[in-house]
Amino acid sequence: MFEAEFKTGAVLKRLVETFKDLLPHATFDCDNRGVSMQVMDTSHVALVSLQLHAEGFKKYRCDRNVPLNVSINSLSKIVKCVNERSSVLMKAEDQGDVMAFVFNNDNRICTYTLKLMCIDVEHLGIPDSDYDCVVHMSSVEFAQVCKDMTQFDHDIIVSCSKKGLQFRANGDIGSADVQMSADNENFSVLKAKQTVTHTFAGDYLCHFAKAAPLAPTVTIYMSEELPFKLEYCIKDVGVLACFLAPKIVNNDEEIF
């Protein structure tokens, strides 16, 4: 038997909102430590990793390891029904074929079931890596910068150095350049061994930035030989990490 109760529906709604347009399906691996998920998008360009700690739930029970394979599109339809102030109980029977969601808001209790999928799951290992650059900034400001950049071009050039972080975009209507310096109260450089510059698909960064309501700050990791990493620490709940492969720049052409 698996049961996990969120104190409010806000976290679940915002998590699903973050990756509903990015991932077709996901496997939630449940054990006595909590709920985890690692899923790549269909283009194998982006990876989303989620860890929800057992102690972060109002109530948590997991008698045995349970993988729950769900359609993200279907899950998003159920989550739309929840009030952010409602408590949310997720539960599933061992060897069952559905996952139940119970939304409790004062005098109204709503129960919805979601059919589980039968899919082959590839368990991915994410090694601990030593990144060249690590910066810390406001998650809302990061989301705004990504949105602004994509008004000019689909691709965003990101550079990280001891001086700070720079976002650039060059398009048909003109160009955009935003620089975050270390003296900004909402920004800090935690580590900068060398200057790192990569080009990324702006759409993916904007998808990741939807997680801004989950945490006030985001930590950005960059290296020449490693994927771009965003990490949101969800207070008292867990960690959401998003990875994105840079685009390969070859003369005037860019391909993944």
From Swiss-Prot:
One of its GO terms (biological process) is translesion synthesis. Residues 61-80 bind DNA. GO terms for molecular function: DNA binding; DNA polymerase processivity factor activity. InterPro entries: DNA_clamp_sf, Pr_cel_nuc_antig, Pr_cel_nuc_antig_C, Pr_cel_nuc_antig_CS, Pr_cel_nuc_antig_N. Keywords: DNA replication, DNA-binding, Early protein. It comes from the Viruses. NCBIfam families: pcna (TIGR00590). HAMAP family: DNApol_clamp_arch. Belongs to the PCNA family. Stimulates the viral DNA replication. The virus utilizes both cellular and viral PCNAs during viral DNA replication in order to produce budded virus (BV). In addition, stimulates the expression of late genes 38K and VP39 by promoting the transcription of IE2. This is Probable DNA polymerase sliding clamp. It comes from Autographa californica nuclear polyhedrosis virus.
